[in-house]
């Protein structure tokens, strides 16, 4: 089987390794009579032995050079019909009885996708808790009935609550209550009446996934040192780690900054109450520390970290954007990439004249579930040709970041987004770039070599 070698990734790594294109082609057996790195080709098909030669030459892993663009990257979306959704059904049993049916919405391979759950645990049974998971989540009641949410062993207002469905015909596109769930929050659900009920839950990839995966590789000695490090509060830990990285002690930092020791001591402990922002920035500058990482957000939610958003709260949030009515679902500033919205489409058209359509695009991945009506999904493919797709209840879509699209017709959807591949921490890195706009433009399909050919 041929390996698809990504030309831009190859050139990028040649630059990192300080190897000219000419030297690479001269010294490394690519298995090709000619590999024109100046051509418009995006990838080269080579043998397994050839890619082995290249990764050994550049000290890389194969996946670091693999061409990964797929069909959905070009058209910008993945569609899943209701029939395909139903085929993903799998039953979960707990304590000997049917507990949930799970269904999975579409997403690219390797991505996290929202799931729909049929809540099967009857109202008279106390649902058994799970152990929670590292990833945060938003969960929305799809109705038609209410559900019980349980988040702790004791049964009280904090640990046990009804997530209502929306019984108002005028606002039924807002299907029900929703809530944000933090990391490792135990949770479970049961029916809260004789009515059936479903939920839509989006358990998203965490921006710390790679960080945690790498730390699971620590040796015993490394783990001891890491656990010693995290015994300090986060801000103090960040400052202490940066000081040790550059060989600063409390005294030498105070001496370099020409500041009294007690002021520097307060800074190191994260006690900023009596410190001016400019002083904090100056100390960070000495240590080459981005001061923004010291500005910690407030941890929101209740005593368990969860945030429940009622139907009434969603109704109050209604607004118009791009000729579509929107309403908010639960969210948390502690997980800014994870968002949920209810959308009402009421802009009937036969779809023949789309010349003046005000397309929308978003900086994050978007998952859509149609909850009512008949809707026309309109999009642009890679050649700027208009694509149309008819949608009805329980059809679903994944739409790529920056993909132009729109909805026409009468109906409703739920939209969920996360930052997988485009998370908000990128914005901090972009903010650190010199000449940010031109730098990012250059990085897109950068075909320039090291410059010493």
Ranges and model annotations:
Residues 150-185, 376-404:
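Short acidic-glycine-tyrosine-enriched beta hairpin
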Residues 60-118, 228-229, 242, 277, ...:
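A short, N-terminal "cap"/entry segment at the start of jelly-roll beta-barrel domains
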Residues 10, 21, 51, 62, ...:
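Helix-turn-helix DNA-binding elements, focusing on the entry/boundary residues of the two helices
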Residues 1-27, 221-248:
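A short, Lys/Arg-rich alpha-helix, primarily the initiator
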Residues 118-122, 130-156, 342-349, 358-381:
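Short, conserved beta-strand element in jelly-roll/cupin
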Residues 192-235, 410-453:
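Double-stranded beta-helix
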Residues 21, 31-34, 62, 250, ...:
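The DNA-contacting recognition helix of HTH DNA-binding domains
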């Amino acid at each position: 089987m041929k390996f698809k070698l990504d030309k831009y990734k190859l050139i990028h790594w040649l630059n990192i390794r300080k190897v000219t294109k000419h030297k690479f082609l001269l010294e490394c057996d690519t298995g090709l009579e000619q590999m024109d790195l100046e051509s418009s080709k995006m990838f080269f098909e080579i043998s397994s032995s050839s890619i082995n030669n290249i990764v050994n030459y550049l000290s890389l892993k194969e996946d670091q050079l693999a061409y990964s663009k797929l069909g959905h990257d070009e058209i910008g979306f993945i569609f899943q019909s209701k029939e395909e959704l139903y085929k993903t059904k799998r039953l979960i049993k707990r304590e000997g009885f049917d507990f949930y049916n799970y269904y999975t919405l579409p997403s690219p391979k390797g991505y996290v996708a929202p799931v729909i759950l049929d809540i099967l645990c009857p109202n008279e049974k106390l649902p058994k808790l799970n152990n929670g998971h590292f990833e945060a989540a938003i969960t929305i009641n799809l109705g038609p009935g209410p559900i019980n949410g349980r988040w702790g062993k004791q049964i009280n207002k904090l640990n046990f609550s009804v997530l209502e469905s929306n019984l108002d015909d005028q606002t039924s596109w807002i299907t029900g209550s929703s809530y944000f769930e933090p990391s490792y929050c135990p949770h479970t659900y049961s029916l809260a009446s004789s009515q059936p009920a479903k939920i839509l839950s989006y358990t998203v990839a965490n921006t710390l996934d790679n960080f945690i995966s790498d730390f699971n590789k620590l040796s015993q000695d490394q783990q001891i040192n890491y656990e010693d490090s995290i015994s300090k509060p986060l801000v103090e830990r960040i400052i202490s780690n940066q000081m040790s990285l550059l060989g600063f002690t409390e005294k030498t930092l105070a001496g370099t900054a020409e500041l009294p020791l007690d002021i520097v001591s307060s800074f190191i402990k994260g006690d900023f109450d009596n410190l001016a922002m400019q002083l904090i920035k100056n100390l960070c500058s000495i240590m080459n520390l981005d001061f923004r990482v010291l500005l910690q957000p407030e941890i929101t939610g209740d005593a368990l970290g969860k945030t429940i958003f009622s139907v009434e709260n969603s109704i109050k949030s209604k607004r118009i954007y791009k000729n579509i009515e929107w309403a908010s679902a639960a969210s948390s500033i502690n997980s800014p990439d994870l968002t949920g919205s209810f959308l009402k489409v009421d802009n009937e058209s036969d779809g023949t004249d789309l010349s003046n359509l005000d397309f929308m695009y978003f900086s994050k991945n978007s998952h859509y579930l149609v909850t009512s009506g008949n809707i026309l999904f309109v999009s642009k493919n890679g050649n700027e040709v208009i694509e149309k797709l008819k949608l009805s209840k329980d059809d679903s879509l994944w739409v790529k970041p920056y993909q132009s699209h729109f909805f026409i017709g009468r109906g409703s959807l739920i939209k969920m987004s996360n930052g997988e591949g485009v998370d908000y921490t990128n914005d901090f890195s972009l903010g650190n770039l010199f000449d940010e706009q031109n730098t990012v433009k250059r990085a897109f399909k950068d075909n320039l070599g090291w410059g010493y050919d």
